Amino acid sequence: MSAETGSRAPHIPVLLEEVVAALDPKPGDLIVDATFGAGGYTRRLLDAGATVHAFDRDPDAIAAGKLWGETCGKEPRLVLHPRRFSEIAEGLAEAGIAGVQGVVFDIGVSSMQLDQAARGFAFSSDGPLDMRMSQEGPSAADFLNEADEGEIADVLYRYGEERQSRRIARAIVAARPLTTTAQFAAVVRKALGYRPDIKGPKAPKDPATRSFQAVRIHVNGELDELVQGLAAAEKVLVPGGRIAVVSFHSLEDRIVKQFLREGAGAVPAGSRHLPQLESKVQAVFEKPSGAIRPTPEEEARNPRARSATLRCAVRTAAPARAHQGRAAA
């Protein structure tokens, strides 16, 4: 999956070798692919002899997975769950499974979704302003046409880290109604004075990228979903089980990093002016690995890998923590 919204490329799993090495799948292992998408990780895990429980809230991904499973000869070891990854525990319980040896997440929008103009995730091709991963609930157009200026600005700032969020929000309200991705992108570009005619290495990044990311995250509740999905993974991993999370922007990576660090027993630093209290936190993960980034060769081969970060950890035998289930504001 990828944070990029303006490029086209065939689906190539990001950090595939590194993810497989982190999960270390063995024949007979049960592994959750929490973000099935086009099945890139799942195929390699099946090749290693594991049974994969694949989750995806996108009905198109599940339909494609069923068709592939029927033709690849590995269908008995591929179990598809048309669910959000926050529902991993419930899906496994329905299948009679109490624990798994591995969980992998590939956070964000998938290459398949980006490359289908009708899904409305990208501005490289004009399409309806949709952006819903599950194809249910309010669309991006619903939000942009109905929310007030302040709410739109807050979403652009919080989820797109857009410093000019208020200027863009004013332009959106003035241009409503918006119905297509091209309209939305054009409004953002005009508001910020973006010049697409400037080419070459010094050309500025299309500012519509940040706004598309922000609206997509909001429409799909992606950060809250990530927090809940990580907590679900902690719950279903057996002692010695492994978690691998690939993220594509700083908002996601901060959540993953904090989750794994606190899971390994790290506690937020207190004030130097107050007495230090002894930590009683029981580590549910071994000390996580540092961030793993794509090699220059992979970035050249797959441009969508450029912003990817992989973080991994191993589950201990400690009981799972109680989680609030929402991303920090």
From Swiss-Prot:
Its EC number is 2.1.1.199. Its main location: cytoplasm. One of its GO terms (biological process) is rRNA base methylation. Residues 289-308 are annotated as: Disordered. GO terms for cellular component: cytoplasm. Disulfide bonds: none annotated. It is an enzyme of class 2 (transferase). It is found in: Cytoplasm. Keywords: Cytoplasm, Methyltransferase, rRNA processing, S-adenosyl-L-methionine, Transferase. The keyword Nucleus does not apply. It catalyses: cytidine(1402) in 16S rRNA + S-adenosyl-L-methionine = N(4)-methylcytidine(1402) in 16S rRNA + S-adenosyl-L-homocysteine + H(+). S-adenosyl-L-methionine binds at G39, G40, Y41, D56, F85, D106, Q113. Pfam families: Methyltransf_5 (PF01795). GO terms for molecular function: rRNA (cytosine-N4-)-methyltransferase activity. SUPFAM superfamilies: Putative methyltransferase TM0872, insert domain (SSF81799), S-adenosyl-L-methionine-dependent methyltransferases (SSF53335). Belongs to the methyltransferase superfamily. RsmH family. Specifically methylates the N4 position of cytidine in position 1402 (C1402) of 16S rRNA. This is Ribosomal RNA small subunit methyltransferase H.
